[in-house]
């Protein structure tokens, strides 16, 4: 009895610590506002059996951090990873975490976003698993052709990868954040990874994006029968929240495009992201405090102006 009392007392002492360490579920991409520390990362979230989201921190606005998120699919025939991290050290941590889940090799890495914060560490995949296959869109394949890990397979529309007993759909739904964004969908588990097509609670990074096409691509992904939907930045919450937040991200992108059109029609100049009078008078309304607004707004306005003027790449 005395021993049981001591155990209970110890648990009661630990309880406040557990409460203090608990994540605060506020809708923000800022880990600090969620009550999280750098030491809380990287972290793995199981979405469905053998399907995971992996969150790691990277520098964001000055003095701040944001997550870069990957998808991990473990099958009886090996592992598929969608997106990597921004440097070899961070990707080595990702590989180590995967090795703790399964002794099976990583067979495929799908490059959903060609940008360095998702591909800069891809050499770590190759070092750990020399036979790994990198898959990308034709646009991203060309962009990464001179890299140390050039994609050898391209998806122009849709490809089904049969890995073990699992079917994995790699989808090219159109241009969005880049010219070659991909999504990965598991029809069996109903999990959809949208990479940088969906940045949870971040101001849209449009400097190399395609404003109206991005909205169209989001809508195509929203039409997919998915329980889980998550993206390449921000946090992964419960399924209902993630769907609601995808709609919120689409609404934000719509508002950014509308504000850019208003300023363009008013004759306010935005010659480049570094020379943009429009950003100083823009009204972002409820999106004023979304993460990275200060750094991303000039490029977003520039890109909306280019779309209006027919100057976007074909």
Language model segments and positions:
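Bacterial N-terminal signal peptides that target proteins for export
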Residues: 1-8
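Sec/Tat signal peptide C-region and signal peptidase I cleavage site
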Residues: 17-21
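Accessory terminal helices/loops
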Residues: 22-34, 223-225, 237-314
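Metallo-beta-lactamase
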Residues: 31, 41, 46, 78-80, 86-88, 137-255, ...
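Conserved beta-strand hairpin/beta-sheet module of binuclear metal-dependent hydrolase folds
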Residues: 46-97, 182-186, 190-194
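Divalent metal-coordination and catalytic microenvironments
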Residues: 50, 73, 83, 98, ...
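Active-site HxH/HxHxD metal-binding segment of metal-dependent hydrolases
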Residues: 92, 96-162
């Amino acid at each position: 009895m005395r021993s049981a009392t001591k155990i209970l007392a110890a648990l009661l002492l630990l309880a406040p610590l557990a409460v203090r360490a608990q994540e605060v579920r506020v809708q923000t991409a800022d880990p600090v506002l969620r009550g999280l520390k750098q030491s809380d990362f990287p972290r793995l979230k199981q979405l469905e059996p053998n399907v995971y989201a992996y969150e790691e921190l990277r520098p964001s606005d000055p003095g701040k951090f944001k997550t870069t998120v990957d998808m991990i699919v473990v099958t009886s025939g090996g592992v598929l990873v969608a997106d990597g991290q921004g440097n070899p050290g961070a990707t080595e941590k990702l590989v180590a975490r995967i090795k703790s889940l399964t002794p099976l090799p990583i067979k495929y890495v799908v490059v959903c976003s060609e940008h360095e914060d998702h591909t800069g560490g891809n050499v770590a995949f190759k070092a750990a698993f020399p036979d790994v296959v990198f898959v990308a869109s034709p646009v991203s394949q060309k962009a990464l052709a001179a890299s140390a890990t050039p994609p050898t397979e391209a998806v122009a529309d849709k490809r089904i990868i049969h890995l073990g007993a699992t079917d994995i759909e790699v989808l090219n739904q159109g241009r969005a954040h880049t010219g070659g964004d991909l999504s990965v969908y598991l029809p069996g588990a109903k999990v959809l990874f949208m990479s940088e097509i969906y940045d949870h609670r971040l101001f849209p990074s449009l400097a190399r994006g395609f404003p109206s096409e991005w909205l169209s691509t989001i809508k195509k992904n929203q039409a997919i029968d998915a329980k889980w939907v998550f993206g390449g930045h921000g946090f992964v919450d419960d399924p209902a929240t993630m769907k609601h937040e995808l709609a919120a991200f689409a609404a934000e992108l719509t508002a950014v495009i509308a504000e850019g059109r208003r300023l363009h029609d008013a004759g306010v100049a935005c010659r480049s992201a570094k020379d943009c009078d429009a950003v100083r008078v823009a009204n972002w309304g409820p999106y004023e405090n979304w993460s990275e607004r200060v750094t991303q707004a000039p490029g977003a306005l520039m890109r909306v102006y280019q779309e209006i003027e027919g100057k976007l790449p074909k």
